[in-house]
Amino acid sequence: MIIESSAPTRVDLAGGTIDIPPLFLFHEGAATVNFAVNLMARVRIETRPDDKIILESVDRDVKFETSLDKLGELYNEPRLELLSKLVYFFKPETGFQMTTESEAPAGAGLAGSSTLNIACIGALNKLVGNRYAPETFIPIAANIECQVIKVPTGFQDYYSAQYGGTAAIHFRPDGMTREALNIDTKSLEERIVICYTGEPRNSGTNNWEITKRHIDGDAETFAIFEGIRDSSRDLREALLANDWVQTGEILKAAYPRRKNLSPNITTPQMDLLIARALTNGAIAAKVCGAGGGGCIAFFCEENRKADVEKALAEEKDAEVLRWNLCERGLTVREL
């Protein structure tokens, strides 16, 4: 049996960090807004006639082998820890090789690990006979990723990976709901530049420091999160109205708020790229994910996307990513 799965990464436009439990419970109307992009995470599982389990990450150039009788040891396996814990959870009863690969740069802030998580869950669930319903994939992914990074994890990234498209994720005491946003996709694509800075980052540590401040009752942090909540609400409305002028203004106003929340969200290299883009046709910069490296999404003036891309491409270590909005989420097929 051969199983292949894929899932899209995402660009988060508004609401980042407020999706980490329990923070959203403290801000009525908490939501995030993001869109999926076709920089995919891919998984291939091929069953074997023996009891060997082979796990391989092409991106990390790591590959190791174990066996079904040692499956319990995968819970504490440090190599390819996410994959190991997922295999331990699903407990397959046949030997197999699982190979993973991501099209997004490592540490890009595009939810690469969360996306790979969903793609692995889809493939492994198929391997064990569709043991779990698709609506359980997101809580499984969040809980296992929390075991790996050892701090609470946000939820928005799993929704874009599983469902694709442009969406607002609403967080309420009775649960989370995904609202698909019907927007002018072509106009969004013509306005957004995604640039990888050449510097990977670790989102878990950055977000945990912010989470602790919030729970400890820091008034300034609480006020910033209220503003983050408001930005998500306003951006959702602007996107639904296809109001690109207002969209740019909302993103522009959100940037200093995010910097106040976490001054280390940008590095000197990122500051340089932001300044370069803003003088060549960008209206606003949105650091992807938790920042401190990774990617920046730039919202551009009408017909200025090419100018921004050209200016960024001239900077050392910067890589302008080629992308399209991805309407389709997780796909799993048996060959």
Where are the predicted features?
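C-terminal nucleotide
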Residues: 1-14, 18-20, 26, 34-35, ...
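DPxDG-like acidic metal-binding loop motif
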Residues: 110-134
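A generic structural signal for short coil/turn motifs at secondary-structure boundaries
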Residues: 107-110, 259-260
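Short secondary-structure capping/junction motifs at helix and strand boundaries
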Residues: 93-99, 130-137
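Glycine-rich active-site/cofactor-binding loop and its immediate structural neighborhood
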Residues: 293
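Hydrophobic alpha-helical hairpins/lids featuring a short glycine-rich hinge
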Residues: 85, 89, 98-104
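Short pre-catalytic strand/loop immediately N-terminal to key active-site residues, enriched for Gly-Thr
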Residues: 104-108, 283-285
